[in-house]
From Swiss-Prot:
It holds the Pfam family ADH_N. InterPro entries: ADH-like_N, GroES-like_sf, NAD(P)-bd_dom_sf, PKS_ER, YIM1/Zinc_Alcohol_DH_Fams. GO terms for cellular component: lipid droplet; mitochondrion. This is Protein YIM1. The gene is YIM1.
Amino acid sequence: MVAHNSVTYINRTTPLTITSEEIDLDRCYKDSEIVVEVHAAALNPIDILLHALSYPSISGRKKKVLGKDYSGVVVKAGKSVKGFKVGDLVNGMYEDFLYRARGSVSNYLILDPSKQLSIAHFKKLEGQTDDDAFIQNAGWPLIFGTAHTLLTEKKQNLGPDSKVLVLGASTSVGNALLKIAKNELKIGTVVGTCSEGSIQYNKETVGFDHLVPYNDTSKSAAQHIRDYVKNELHGEKFDLIADCCGSNEFFPFINEIMKSKTKNGHYLTIVGDNKFNYRKIELLKAINICGLIRRFNPFKNYNYSFTMVPSASDYMELGAKMIQKGTYKPQIDSVYDFEQYQDAVERLLSNRAKGKIVIKVK
């Protein structure tokens, strides 16, 4: 028997807390499952959202475990498991939106890799410590999967002649999207929006072709983009607008900057029309009415939809490959010990994080 500690909650009225139980590592898994000893787990806004929307009347009384992104070591493997063995270094995104009886901010994570497809093997980079490897690889599954899905889910076959606009170039998703777009899909033009102070970094270090500020008091970001399409792209519109931060200011100009339905243009959002205030989340406010109208309005002449990350192995394998090649480096904002989980949550709620917030579980 071993101690198994997790950061858990019951519903939105109960605070996060560390709960402990004992599990028998020889009996706690099925033939189709593996047991991962978690070394690091990363927090994502969806973790806070799920806690905040766990209303007592619908979420039940069972404890729910915080977290999705993880990295660790396989310590047990069922006899029917294929592709994973004891000692493997693995990372992934654990998906259980409904019950959340298992999560990544815990000592052990039991999963069926034939169902939980967002899992991959990883290798330490040359000169990298064990801790650094676990921290880095806990920090990218969800955001990299989101970026990959934005670029591929509509099967636009984006390439050298394509043009992509990223709203939120400084976000972790925006960074990953740029790296996939340039290094794997070889997309010709990737433009982003960010603060004036981040333009130089996002262009010279990250690699965006052009950036416009969202905090220019003389002209909105949407007006900047409209002028850029007209003057620099000579009227050639974007194939894809990927909203990684929550914005609605581009819709008045949408027909001037993005290709229409008939030309397979797509506006994809992972947030909705506005940036969430994760300290004050209510169910009705979380439902994006304007977004629903845009999505289901039969009279609009552009494609608009929300993007959700599927459980899939392709983006996990791609992310691991790009890290090994040096074409993608996950951004890590800060690292906290397991007992400092509340400080990690506060950092996420601050909206000031520049990269992933990681909790060291071991």
